Amino acid sequence: MIEIKNVTYSYLDIIALNNINLEIKPGEAVALMGANGCGKSTLLKLINGIISPERGSYRFDGEEITHKKLQDNKFSKQLHQRIGFVFQNSDTQLFCSSVFEEIAFGPRQMGLDELEVTKRVKDCLKLLNIENFESRIPYHLSGGEKRKVAIACVMSLNPDVLVLDEPMNGLDPKTQRWLVEFLVKLNKAGKTLIISTHNLELVHEISTRAILFNEEHTIVADMSTKELLKDINLLKKVNLVDEYYH
């Protein structure tokens, strides 16, 4: 499904991804792990088609994703319909006057008729158990409530792949537990999950495979999540835990 070969990406002169090679198959639940600034968020943006490789190649379902193709509005919409992205800061993707309008925005951009748009909004409100949010202003919601609305917006397009950047950040324990259970259900239903996270307590519940980055912006490990969590020396080496971690 996702094939990344020898990909490098920089912000001006600062390298964010350094010769990345990675394959992700349909239905996998993959965690991207590493210290802040190691390249996790940049890789998620590349997978979602927000940016394209400077060097190397990125293929989705066998088709190479290039800057030129992403400039084509039709191609870009089709890609974003299949790959949903939940940003770390929910405020960056919530900008409409009500939760209903927020969730309806994506389907309308895809050209769906209003009956289908309304059905999708209602289905997503029910799926996320936020039916009472329908007429509320997104700006007035709590952090956890905003995260649920952001996920509902993405789910309204019924993507094959769900990409989440630090989804546990800023959530209280109850909302974290809800999100873990929700993601597990999505994965069991066949959705491919790609999640960046620092949460060592919950990562084994939401992923079966872990990709570990070092501070040189390269991948240093690709193994089962449970195996990685047992390798404390490796986690210390990439500054994901400190010397007092047990």
Give the role of each language-model region.
Residues 162-165:
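Catalytic Walker B motif of ABC-type/P-loop ATPase nucleotide-binding domains
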Residues 217-239:
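Conserved beta-strand-loop-alpha-helix hinge in the C-terminal portion
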Residues 197-198:
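H-loop/switch region of ABC-family ATPase nucleotide-binding domains
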Residues 48:
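Helix-to-loop junction immediately C-terminal to a conserved catalytic motif
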Residues 137-141, 145:
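Conserved ABC ATPase signature
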Residues 115-133:
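Conserved ABC ATPase "signature" region
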Residues 33-35:
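The feature captures the beta-strand-to-loop junction immediately N-terminal to the Walker
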